[in-house]
Every structure is written in structure tokens, then in C-alpha cells.
A protein has these predicted regions:
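Catalytic and substrate-binding regions of extracellular carbohydrate-active enzymes
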Residues: 1-209, 214-220, 233
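Polysaccharide-binding surfaces and accessory modules of carbohydrate-active proteins
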Residues: 3-5, 222-277
């Protein structure tokens, strides 16, 4: 068994605010006043409220004489959940679909990754001749790490097995032969935390990578199914950009080729008259 305090949250009007306990860190030393320290159990909770612009929002925590629990959940099956605005459907291979229930539009097969080799200069991507790309994971798993009426979090773990590095090989007489992948293999594990909040049209995504390989480029694949241009954040502006290469194949014979990837400042997406992502 585990000891859990019973308490309530109330807003400024005195109304109860539903919450969900996310985690408890026990026996934590915290500064109470000046050089006075006390030992606490630190509760991390999830709840929904409104924050005033250029002001503050007050919540009151008070002990509860009754047990505080909820049997409600946003999950609709083993591998799906909805908050009435968005619906999530997870697949055994480690991808998931997002459906906007307001428009009925679905964005499918998210959480795909692509590995290929990298011999660039740190500024531009350059691939070696005979560049091989790894497109599928060798193992995937799905866990529900948080399940309640306010927040539901799924954790996807995908493991990729790829050659550990590139080798610059020599031949007889120490002549340089070329670049090839090593015969030793290494594993790259990618954990994706997908968080769905009550009454929210935003999906929380957090990625954690455990890497034991080198000399590769990792790309996140997020298909939208929306044709046309994209928009990208830049300093003090949102720019419309052509999907793919702006110049098409015009730089095939040039000294410096045009790269598909362009720099962005924290925002990129696609949209049409029905919305976007």
C-alpha cells in the first residue's frame, strides 16, 4: 500500500477544481522561510484552469475529510483515447494517428523516424556514396504512464539497430579505399511521450533519445496529407515556403546544391481551408 494525502483544490469562487495526481516525491527538503528547512512530500498534479493576462490566478488547497479519487478516463480502448476534440489511435509498430473530431481530418502514421549516414561539415548534410537508410524499428512497445480524467499519457519506445559508425578504409599498401559502414552494430532507442489533456486541442509530444551510434542523420517523419506550401517561423515573421526545393532541379549541375531542409525558428506547419497542423 501507499500513503496518499486527501486534499481538494478550489478556485477563487470556491468551486472545486478537478485534479489528477501525476507523481509524489517523498521526504524532500524545502526551504520554508529564510534558513528554515522542512521535510515535505511533494505532489505534482494536473488540472485545468485559466491564467489571467498580466495578473495572477489563485487556487486554494485544503484538506479533504473524504477520499479524493476518480474512476474516469479518456481512454476508449487499449490503444486509443479521446478528449472530445482529438482522438488518438496507436499502432503496434510504434506509430499513431491523430484525428481532429471537429473537422474529421486524420493525420496518420506519426512517430516515424528515418536514419541515414552523415559525412557533412556540421552546416550542411552530405551523404556518402551508396548511402543506406534505415526506415523501420526492430522493436516497439507501448505503455500508458498516466491515465485519468485530466491527462492521459502514452509512452512509445522504438528501438533501432544500425551499424555503429562509418569507417574510412584502407587497402593494400595503406591506400585509401573509401567509406563504408562498420560491421559492428549499435542500438538507438527513441521514447515518445504523447500527452492528451482534457478539453484541449493541443497534443503534447516529448522525445527522449538513447544513442549508442554515430555518423548518422536522424529525421522525424510527420506526414500531413496536405498539399501545397508550408509555413515556417523566422525572426519576427512567419514565412510561406514551397514544399521541397524552391529551385526544383535547377541546382543539380551547380557547385552548391539546394537542400530540402531549411532553417526554422521554433515553428513549422501546413494548413489549408479545413485547418492544419
Amino acid at each position: 500500500y501507499e500513503f496518499v494525502n486527501s486534499f481538494q483544490l478550489r478556485n477563487e469562487a470556491g468551486a472545486l477544481v478537478p485534479y489528477q495526481i501525476v507523481s509524489i516525491r517523498r521526504n524532500q527538503m524545502r526551504q520554508f522561510q529564510w534558513n528554515v528547512f522542512r521535510r515535505y512530500d511533494v505532489y505534482r498534479v494536473a488540472f485545468r484552469t485559466k491564467l489571467r493576462a498580466a495578473g495572477w490566478t489563485t487556487l486554494r488547497l485544503e484538506p479533504s475529510p473524504d477520499f479524493v479519487r476518480s474512476y474516469r478516463t479518456m481512454r476508449t480502448s487499449q490503444r486509443s483515447a479521446t478528449n472530445g476534440i482529438l482522438r488518438l489511435d496507436f499502432h503496434p509498430e510504434g506509430t499513431f494517428d491523430v484525428t481532429d473530431l471537429r473537422s474529421g481530418r486524420s493525420f496518420r502514421n506519426w512517430n516515424e523516424f528515418r536514419f541515414d549516414r552523415e559525412i557533412g561539415d556540421g552546416w550542411n548534410h552530405v551523404e556518402p556514396i551508396g548511402n543506406a537508410a534505415l526506415l523501420c524499428s526492430s522493436e516497439s512497445s507501448l505503455r500508458v504512464t498516466l491515465d485519468g480524467p485530466e491527462r492521459t499519457t502514452f509512452e512509445i519506445t522504438r528501438r533501432y539497430r544500425l551499424p555503429a559508425s562509418l569507417r574510412y578504409e584502407g587497402g593494400l599498401g595503406e591506400n585509401y579505399v573509401g567509406i563504408r559502414e562498420s560491421e559492428e552494430f549499435a542500438e538507438v532507442a527513441i521514447r515518445t511521450m504523447v500527452t492528451l489533456d482534457r478539453d484541449s486541442d493541443q497534443l503534447g509530444l516529448h522525445f527522449a533519445i538513447e544513442n549508442h551510434a554515430e555518423d548518422f542523420r536522424l529525421q522525424l517523419i510527420a506526414p500531413t496529407g496536405i498539399p501545397g506550401n508550408c509555413f515556417a517561423g523566422q525572426n519576427f515573421a512567419i514565412l510561406n515556403r514551397k514544399a521541397g526545393r524552391e529551385l526544383g532541379d535547377a541546382t543539380e549541375g551547380g557547385f552548391e546544391r539546394e537542400f530540402i531542409e531549411k532553417n526554422i525558428s521554433g515553428l513549422i506547419g501546413k494548413r489549408d481551408a479545413s485547418g492544419g497542423v
